[in-house]
Structures are given as structure tokens and as C-alpha cells.
């Protein structure tokens, strides 16, 4: 009887999760931190400036429903100038080579530098490298920003690129080259942060298994560790 109940519950969960409209995904509220790592991630949450292209959207909801994204048609920001439900920034952190790494990621429904160019879905991310999250005043050692399957490393970042503890990040494209991140002196906006370990099982499973086409979830298992290695600043 118990086994039957478990199978039925899994079946219901599987049925409930679906690909839905990019503007129908409800983001997670930002939880109250319950650990040093979560508190540090909130304290160093970056801000995002959009030079051109889509604004960030939530990629997954608590039930595991994922965004269907957008075709790269119309202007670079057509149909994706912001969700009525609010946006989301995703985080995951770990020690790497004796340094504390916080990966912050954003999802965009399309990466379209110009009408007809680009692709559905875009994931971009940064890694903020800290000396130690447990000390009274952790220090930013470097920031690595994703750019066309590689990284631009700011070691150390220019003070104009920081607002206190918050790195200022720009989402941009030039001509017909797909979007990327860079640091900027321009102020941006922040989004509610949800860490990998704060998500529901359904959301983690969805991000782990969903095919986002030419984009990939940088912080999921199997990607997170290799991305940190590639983003390493030394």
C-alpha cells in the first residue's frame, strides 16, 4: 500500500511539471538565510544592468514547471522586458582552491542580438570569489563573468564596478554577437535570490533535466564544478 502511494505521488509530481509560457513562471520568494553561506550570498548579491536584450526572468517555479523561452524574433527585447511576477537570481556556493566561490546565475527567455539571430533561452552567470565567508568582513578577491562559453576575469575588480559588496554586471551584445556579461560602472537592479539548496526538489530536478537548447544551467550538478574550474581567476 505504501509503495503504491509513493509511486502515485511521483506520477502526480511528474504530470504537474510542464513547460509553460516564459511570462507565467512564478519566481521563488527570497528565503530568510539559515546558514553562513546563505547569508553571505545575500550580502554579496550583485546588480544587473541591461544594455540591450531581454530582462531576466524566472526559469522554474516551485512545482518544477520551466520556461518555454522565446523565439529570437522581433527586437532583442521584444516580448521579454520583464515578468509581471518578478524576476529571479540563482545562486550556489562552495570552496574552490581554498577560496569561497559564489556563482550567481540569471535566465533570459532568448538570446537575440538582432531579429532572426540568436537562439531560444539564455543562461549567463558570474562567480564572485571571496577570501572567507566566515570572517567578519569577507573580501572580494575577483569576479569572473560569463562570455561566449568562456570568462572575463576581473582580478581585482575596479572599485567603480562595485557598489559596496555588490558587483555591477552588464548584459550586452555587440552587432550580431550573442549576449554576454561584463562588469560595469552603471548601476543595475537586484532580484530575489534563491540558492540551489533552498529550492524544492521539483525545481532542482527540473533544472537538472530540462533541455534549454543552446543554453545550459551553469549551477546544476555536473556543470557547477567544471564552471568554477574554467572561471578560476589565477
From Swiss-Prot:
Task: From the Swiss-Prot or TrEMBL record, state where the protein is found.
Answer: Secreted
Q: What are the annotated GO cellular component locations?
A: extracellular region
Question: Which positions does the motif Hepta-peptide GHRHDWE motif II occupy?
Answer: 118-124
Where do we find the motif Conserved undecapeptide motif I here? Answer: 101-111
Under Pfam families, the record lists: NPP1 (PF05630)
Instruction: Kindly summarize what the UniProt induction comment says about this protein's expression.
Output: Expression reached the highest levels at 3 days after inoculation of pepper leaves, followed by a gradual decline.
Q: Which residues form the signal peptide?
A: 1-17
Which coarse location class describes where this protein primarily resides?
secreted
Q: Which InterPro entries match?
A: NPP1
Where are the annotated glycans?
A: 65
Q: Which UniProt keywords apply?
A: Glycoprotein, Secreted, Signal, Virulence
Its function, per the record, reads: Secreted effector that contributes moderately to virulence during infection by P.capsici. Does not cause visible reaction of C.annuum for several days after inoculation, but by 7 days after inoculation, small necrotic lesions become visible. Leads only to chlorotic areas, without necrosis at 7 days after non-host N.benthamiana leaves infection.
Family indicated by similarity: Belongs to the Necrosis inducing protein (NPP1) family.
- Which protein, by its recorded name, is this? NLP effector protein 10
Amino acid at each position: 500500500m505504501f509503495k503504491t502511494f509513493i509511486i502515485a505521488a511521483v506520477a502526480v509530481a511528474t504530470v504537474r511539471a510542464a513547460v509553460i509560457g516564459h511570462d507565467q513562471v512564478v519566481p521563488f520568494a527570497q528565503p530568510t538565510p539559515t546558514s553562513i553561506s546563505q547569508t553571505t550570498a545575500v550580502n554579496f548579491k550583485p546588480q544587473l544592468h541591461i544594455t540591450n536584450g531581454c530582462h531576466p526572468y524566472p526559469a522554474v517555479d516551485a512545482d518544477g514547471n520551466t520556461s518555454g523561452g522565446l523565439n529570437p524574433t522581433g527586437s532583442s527585447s521584444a516580448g521579454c522586458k520583464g515578468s509581471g511576477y518578478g524576476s529571479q537570481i540563482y545562486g550556489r556556493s562552495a570552496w574552490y582552491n581554498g577560496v569561497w566561490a559564489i556563482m550567481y546565475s540569471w535566465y533570459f527567455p532568448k538570446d537575440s542580438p538582432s531579429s532572426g539571430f540568436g537562439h531560444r533561452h539564455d543562461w549567463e552567470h558570474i562567480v564572485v570569489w571571496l577570501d572567507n565567508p566566515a570572517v567578519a568582513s569577507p573580501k572580494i578577491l575577483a569576479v569572473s563573468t560569463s562570455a561566449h562559453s568562456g570568462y572575463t576575469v576581473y582580478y581585482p575588480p575596479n572599485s567603480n564596478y562595485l557598489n559596496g559588496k555588490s558587483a555591477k554586471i552588464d548584459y550586452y551584445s555587440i552587432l550580431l554577437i550573442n549576449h554576454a556579461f561584463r562588469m560595469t560602472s552603471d548601476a543595475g537592479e537586484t532580484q530575489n535570490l534563491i540558492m540551489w539548496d533552498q529550492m524544492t526538489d521539483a525545481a532542482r530536478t527540473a533544472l537538472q533535466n530540462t533541455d534549454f537548447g543552446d543554453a545550459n544551467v551553469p549551477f546544476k550538478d555536473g556543470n557547477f564544478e567544471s564552471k568554477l574550474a574554467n572561471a578560476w581567476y589565477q
